[in-house]
Amino acid sequence: MRIVFKIGSNLLETDEGDIDLSFLSKLAEGIKKLHSFGDKVLIVSSGAVLSGAKKLGIKEKPKDLTLKQALASVGQSYLMHLYDTIFSNYGLKVGQVLLTKDVFSKEKEERFKNAKSTLEKLLELGVVPVINENDAVAVEELVFGDNDFLAVYVSFMVNADLLVIFSSAGGLKDDKDRIIPVVEDIEKVFKYVRGTGTSFGTGGMRSKLEATRLATTLNIPVIITSKEENILDLRNLKTKGTLFKPSKRKLRNALKVIATLEEPKGIIVVDRGAQEALKAGKSLLPAGVVSVQGNFKRGDVVSIQNEEGLIIGKGKVNFSSEEIEKIKGLKTSEVRKLLNTTKDEVIHRDNMVIFL
């Protein structure tokens, strides 16, 4: 079994503002036991900026990107020192892997393959990879959303069987502040989202839910839970937090690539009727298109967004943005006459992945 643990900055910090060494010890002990079952474990760990701030005596979350990157440079080595020291007490070896967003790009496929090969070799050697975004050189500001999405991309890269996201919230809570034990339809629980991140984190529950939605679409189960969780229970999908069940629709690899590695060139906004049709496995027809954002050509990948602003899918378009502007809202028969084409769909269902 392959398990990815995602640890945010807030989980690494105690109430007193120190690095939580006891949690890292508990995690190492749990991973040691998982190894005894033959499981492979990877850690996606935030905390470089937090660790750098602790080392330099900075108490407030930095707003300046250059300062963040400088703190990440100082903090990443200290963070890995902590992992190495604590995990070695349990006979575990760790390996640092720093990634940037362009690793997960179809246009730079060799970087993806190289990163995957490195992670596979580390796992083969019995090493626990500790993965973080390379904040010190990132061009865009912390683009992975407190590493929630990075954890999903890594899970996809290594064909993980489970993604565990540790959260100070302990799981997804309903409107009465009760943890929801199991979620099968993630669209229905977005209404419970609250929080935009902690002092040194950039995520929050919305980021975690959006990342979880992508993971479950990729057929990866996700658990959001607290750091008090029993590590061994997790491998059996038992949790005191929230278990998000994977989608029942099995995606072929080409669609998984669209969902993860293809950078969208634009956005197509659809109405409620089209959203329900897409959820039911139908193609996207011009009649359901409300508007188009960006400039793209035929064959490009775009994001599909509902009228509430939620990204609900991605897919390869049969028409350019200019053509879709002309045919949006029209019936199929009208489209054929206007564009002199035999194609009916803006995006065919075979070239589309829906996150609902």
From Swiss-Prot:
EC number: 2.7.2.11
The keyword Nucleotide-binding appears for this protein: yes
UniProt GO BP: L-proline biosynthetic process; proline biosynthetic process
InterPro entries tied to this protein: AceGlu_kinase-like_sf, Asp/Glu/Uridylate_kinase, G5K_ProB, Glu/AcGlu_kinase, Glu_5kinase, Glu_5kinase/COase_Synthase, Glutamate_5-kinase_CS, PUA
Transmembrane segments: none
Record's catalysed reaction(s): L-glutamate + ATP = L-glutamyl 5-phosphate + ADP
GO cellular component, one term: cytosol
Domain PUA: from-to ranges: 265-342
CDD domains on file: AAK_G5K_ProB, PUA_G5K
MF terms (GO), sorted A to Z: ATP binding; glutamate 5-kinase activity; RNA binding
Keywords attached to this entry: Amino-acid biosynthesis, ATP-binding, Cytoplasm, Kinase, Nucleotide-binding, Proline biosynthesis, Transferase
Binding positions for ATP per the UniProt entry: 6, 202-208
Compartmental location: Cytoplasm
Superkingdom of origin: Bacteria
Enzyme class, first EC level, given as a word: transferase
Described purpose of this protein according to its UniProt entry: Catalyzes the transfer of a phosphate group to glutamate to form L-glutamate 5-phosphate.
Protein family membership: Belongs to the glutamate 5-kinase family.
NCBIfam families per record: proB (TIGR01027), unchar_dom_2 (TIGR00451)
Cited PANTHER family: GLUTAMATE 5-KINASE (PTHR43654), ISOPENTENYL PHOSPHATE KINASE (PTHR43654:SF1)
Name of the protein described by the UniProt record: Glutamate 5-kinase
Organism: Aquifex aeolicus (strain VF5)
